[in-house]
Amino acid sequence: MATSTTTSLKEFLSVFPQLVADLRALCLEEYQLPACVWDRFESTLNHNTLGGKCNRGLSVIDSVRLLRDGLELSPAEYFDAAVLGWLVELLQATMLVLDDIMDGSPTRRGKPSWYRVPGVGMAAVNDATMLESAIYMLLKKYFAGRAIYLPVVDLFHETALQIELGQAFDMLIANEGTPDLTTFVPATYSQIVTYKTAFYSFYLPVALALHAVDAATPTNLAAARAILVPMGEYFQVQDDYLDCFADPTVLGKVGTDIIEGKCSWLVVQALQRASTDQAQLLAENYGSASGESSVKALYSELDLESVYRTFEEQRVAELRTLITGLDESQGLRKSVFEELLGKIYQRRK
């Protein structure tokens, strides 16, 4: 067992086979389903849950350790935290499968998107729902009858709905690639990313950790949310920047925000700075494959890379101020938030 406050990916990955075995037993032994059904489920699990950085899942374990002031977790405590972490990764996998279909993304994590794998296609929609349902079966197996069970079930249900509502807002405002750019304003962007990204990527792992150490008081949850939502927005701004400016071979996927007409941070910033002619260029080209190069050229003309770097430093300074003022009297720890911020600051993929 690692003694540092940062768990290793190898250690975290070592728990996954047990969860796969649990689901295998459910399908083949309890449900008596044919092997072909389990084979499909297992392929779905392995392709979509593995292969990423697992930052969300690892954050659950790291947060539990930090909330316990860096004390080494017992094997049972580590396993519980790792299970909760893997359930966050299953929720992430669910949403990525569906997001890739809606965005038409050809790759994910350097591999073909699941729906692009031969023999999968639109059946990936059902595969995604299997991934989400697995969350609740595993929660039942490991936490039923314990005090955290119902609050954590509720937390996963609410978080899933938040993501889905954020995704719906994102798609509606993109209007199938023909967006009304007058609606692309900072307040709208902030609301979309709060629900689409911030809650599940940042608030969920820490809230789960607070439940795991019996410190999920209303005060602590509210304080965590006040820091983690703007941190999650910063993370999504990074994603939007990387979607346009990062090397796809490094990022592991091909950016599609411009082609899809998404309400990206970059286009919101461009619209705030554009002249009348530049705004017209955006209106004519944003949301089409043929106009992507023109939009990227305009982003360079407006020096949005510098705008992004300025935003990053300002947001990080604001977050550090919030962390400094955090009340630790009910068991919350500043180190939880410092650790998360350190992981994402100036990331390049």
From Swiss-Prot:
The keyword Lyase does not apply. It holds the Pfam family polyprenyl_synt. It is an enzyme of class 2 (transferase). Dimethylallyl diphosphate binds at residues 108, 196-197, 236, 253, 262. Mg(2+) 1 binds at residues 99, 103. Keywords: Magnesium, Metal-binding, Transferase. It catalyses: isopentenyl diphosphate + dimethylallyl diphosphate = (2E)-geranyl diphosphate + diphosphate; isopentenyl diphosphate + (2E)-geranyl diphosphate = (2E,6E)-farnesyl diphosphate + diphosphate. Mg(2+) 2 binds at residues 99, 103. Viridicatumtoxin and its derivative, viridicatumtoxin B, exhibit anti-methicillin-resistant Staphylococcus aureus (anti-MRSA) activity. Moreover, viridicatumtoxin and a C2 acetyl analog, spirohexaline, have been demonstrated to inhibit bacterial undecaprenyl diphosphate synthase, a potential new target for antibiotic development. GO terms for cellular component: cytoplasm. Pathway: Secondary metabolite biosynthesis; terpenoid biosynthesis. Binds 2 Mg(2+) ions per subunit. Its EC number is 2.5.1.10, 2.5.1.1. Isopentenyl diphosphate binds at residues 53, 56, 92, 109. One of its GO terms (biological process) is viridicatumtoxin biosynthetic process. GO terms for molecular function: (2E,6E)-farnesyl diphosphate synthase activity; dimethylallyltranstransferase activity; metal ion binding. Belongs to the FPP/GGPP synthase family. Farnesyl pyrophosphate synthase; part of the gene cluster that mediates the biosynthesis of viridicatumtoxin, a tetracycline-like fungal meroterpenoid with a unique, fused spirobicyclic ring system. The first step of the pathway is the production of the malonamoyl-CoA starter unit for the polyketide synthase vrtA. The aldolase vrtJ may be involved in the synthesis of the malonamate substrate for malonamoyl-CoA synthetase vrtB. This is Farnesyl pyrophosphate synthase vrtD. It comes from Penicillium aethiopicum. The gene is vrtD.
